[in-house]
Regions:
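Conserved N-terminal diphosphate/IPP-binding helix and adjacent helical/loop segment
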Residues: 2, 9-17, 21-144, 148-149, ...
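Short glycine/serine- and small hydrophobic-enriched flexible loop segments
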Residues: 118-122, 147, 199-207, 274-278, ...
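Inter-helical turn/loop segments and adjacent helix faces that build the functional surface
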Residues: 123-128, 203-221, 241-255, 274-290, ...
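Active-site alpha-helical segments that house and flank conserved acidic catalytic motifs
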Residues: 132-162, 220-232, 266, 270-277, ...
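Divalent-cation-assisted or electrostatically stabilized phosphate/pyrophosphate-binding catalytic cores
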Residues: 160-194, 245-265, 288, 314-340, ...
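Short hairpin/turn module used for nucleic-acid contact or packing/dimerization
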Residues: 363-421
Length: 421
């Protein structure tokens, strides 16, 4: 299913909690070339207790998303949650449940968004200092908010191999024999936890310690990211509700592509990268090249996520096999199979898609049809095309960027599109 180029060396990495290995690839044709970094002047530092800026710098320079980098981001998350807990404690002991849910969710993940913010900043001449670490950490809180809300909207049972937050609260409601609906209680708790993550993300970003002029440059993209993600989420639920029968394959593809762009690609890669670069004072031409790199790579990243949602190993992805089929997600794979399969098979596929009681046999049949219809190969080709477009845009920006950072971004392009979780 996954074709690894002979020019790519495959390495195993782990996420921040030592689980869920994913494929990391290092381009053998792009050797590391040291380059003296340009630096912005020192920032005053964050308002809260800092983690080790020296450790962050070492972690960044040792590997784009290695164990040291992930450990440093995790330590920053833990420190910030501890600070916020101090504000929750006087309200009521039960309020700590919100922090518990957030902390549990944020123990996992690959820290992609902090990585792209960091390398965007360094690429444009910024420093991997304490202020940048805190800004990068804000991306994780923002993603946690999106995941908490997304699991509610998708009615997901699990996230990263454990019960989704709304399921945990619903079960707690049952165990304590509370009044009312357990499901409504769980949904309300997850929504509030997601809202709180948005608050904490904004606090982490605005108080990160960047100089006022850096924040003035970066803040518009931060605001745009938040607005566009919410619009993308709405497009996703609208796309799931609107009928497809009257649409041809091109119209379906356009709907799916637009959702991918605004729900995933921009906030996963393009916007974190640009926030970091904007803070460092990137010039307009280089910024456009970085934007093109981030958008195309973000689209490829989401397409890989769609493939894993159908073919991924549950022990690695933390999601049940074929979970996207059970949830009825209208992805590029679905567009492809409906266009490529014979009418009878396409009709059966449509009938099964989104069935909560989808059997293992039906899941296998649907996966096989996606493969035999050519949809899987088409998506793999599109992943390669988008990644190549991203790398071409990065090459156009190379002359004005830090060389070491460019090599890291090349490496990240392969890592994000050739992974197993």
């Amino acid at each position: 299913m996954f074709h690894v180029s002979p020019h790519i060396q495959t390495v195993r990495l782990y996420d921040s909690c030592g689980q869920d290995p994913f494929i990391h690839t290092t381009p053998t044709t792009s050797p590391h070339r040291p380059h003296p970094r340009r630096r912005t002047r020192a920032s005053p530092g964050p308002r809260h207790a800092p983690t080790s800026a020296a450790a962050y710098h070492v972690a960044v320079t040792s590997h784009p998303l290695g164990d040291a980098f992930q450990a440093t981001i995790s330590a920053s998350i833990t420190a910030q949650i501890a600070d916020h807990r101090a504000h929750l404690a006087p309200i009521d002991p039960a309020a700590d449940e919100l922090a518990q849910a957030i902390e549990s969710l944020m123990q996992g993940g690959k820290r992609l968004r902090p990585g792209f913010l960091t390398w965007g900043h360094v690429a444009a001449g910024g420093s991997a200092d304490e202020a940048t670490l805190q800004a990068a950490t804000a991306m994780e809180f923002f993603q946690a908010a999106a995941l908490l809300h997304d699991d509610v909207m998708d009615d997901s049972d699990t996230r990263r191999g454990t019960p989704a937050a709304h399921r945990v609260w619903a079960q707690r409601h049952r165990e304590h024999a509370f009044e009312g609906s357990p499901e409504d209680h769980g949904i309300a708790g997850a929504i509030l936890a997601g809202d709180l993550c948005l608050v904490w993300a904004d606090a982490a970003f605005t108080e990160c310690g960047w100089e006022p002029e850096q924040m003035l440059r970066a803040r518009p993209t931060w605001n745009l990211m938040r607005t566009q993600l919410m619009a993308g989420q709405f497009l996703d639920i609208l796309n799931a509700a609107r009928p497809w029968e009257t649409l041809d394959a091109d119209a379906r593809h356009e709907r799916v592509r637009r959702v991918m762009e605004y729900k995933s690609a921009k906030y996963s890669i393009e916007h974190p990268l640009l926030i970091g670069a904007d803070a460092a004072g990137v010039d307009p031409t280089t910024r456009q090249h970085l934007s093109d790199y981030g958008l195309h790579l973000g689209l490829a990243f989401q397409l890989r996520d769609d493939v894993l949602g159908v073919y991924g190993d549950p022990s690695v992805t933390g999601k049940p096999a074929g979970d996207d089929l059970r949830e009825g997600k209208r992805t590029a794979l679905v567009v492809g199979v409906l266009a490529g399969a014979d009418p009878a098979d396409a009709e059966r596929f449509t009938h099964l898609l989104g069935s909560p009681d989808l059997s293992a046999e039906d899941t296998t049949w649907m996966r096989d049809l996606i493969t035999s219809s050519g949809a899987a190969d088409q998506v793999e080709q599109q992943i390669d095309t988008d990644r190549d477009r991203a790398l071409a845009a990065l090459e156009r920006a190379r002359p004005t960027l830090d060389t070491e950072a460019v090599e890291a971004l090349v490496e990240l392009a392969h890592l994000t599109t050739r992974r197993a979780s």
